[in-house]
From Swiss-Prot:
Substrate binds at Y15, G16, S17, F18, Q19, D20. It comes from the Eukaryota. The lineage of its organism: Eukaryota, Viridiplantae, Streptophyta, Embryophyta, Tracheophyta. It comes from Arabidopsis thaliana (Mouse-ear cress). SUPFAM superfamilies: Gamma-glutamyl cyclotransferase-like. It is an enzyme of class 2 (transferase). One of its GO terms (molecular function) is acyltransferase activity. The gene is AIG2LA. Belongs to the gamma-glutamylcyclotransferase family. Coiled coil: none annotated. This is AIG2-like protein A. Putative gamma-glutamylcyclotransferase.
Length: 165
């Protein structure tokens, strides 16, 4: 039985590893339409010892990323589980880079805005070169575990995505 909420579609701004279609395909088991966009009023940071970035509000900041178009509620729950409890899903305004259209979308904001582990600018091209392969292999394992009755907890997900492993 389908509820109307499960049929609702969402647009989600991503700014880290989820910009990569190969990663999204593993996460969602499909590749949705992806458009380039800019998120004003935020800044992206690297996180010490982690393979993924975070964003926090910043008056003069601007983050370039992608919007995943037409994400289902079930897929959004998968993204929520992967992002874990260090991020908060919020609604923000982005500007599409292809047509300058402004849109309200969901994104994941780092909860601890004063986190001492935040530093420097996270670089997508560097991530692809150095970490993409490991990231995809790890997520394939995680998604397989999630399909099993016992599943794998959110804490396990964040621990396997450390730079020092």
């Amino acid at each position: 039985m389908c509820s109307s909420d499960s049929l609702q579609l969402h647009n989600v701004f991503v700014y880290g590893s989820f910009q990569d279609p190969d990663v999204i395909n593993v996460m969602l088991d499909r590749t949705p339409e992806i458009v380039s966009a800019t998120l004003p009023g935020f800044q992206r940071f690297r996180l010490k010892g982690r393979l993924y970035p975070c964003i926090v509000p910043s008056e003069k900041g601007e983050v370039h990323g992608k919007v995943l178009m037409g994400v289902t509620s079930d897929e959004l729950e998968n993204l929520d589980a992967v992002e874990g409890n260090e991020y908060e899903r919020v609604t923000v305004g982005i500007v599409r880079e292809d047509n300058s259209e402004k849109m309200a979308v969901k994104t994941y904001m780092w909860i601890n805005k004063a986190d001492p582990d935040m530093f420097g600018e996270w670089n997508f091209e560097e991530w692809k070169r150095l970490h993409k392969k490991k990231f995809i292999e790890t997520f394939k394992k995680i998604m397989e575990c999630k399909k099993k009755p016992q599943g794998q907890g959110n804490d396990d997900i964040s621990h396997v995505l450390r730079e020092d492993q």
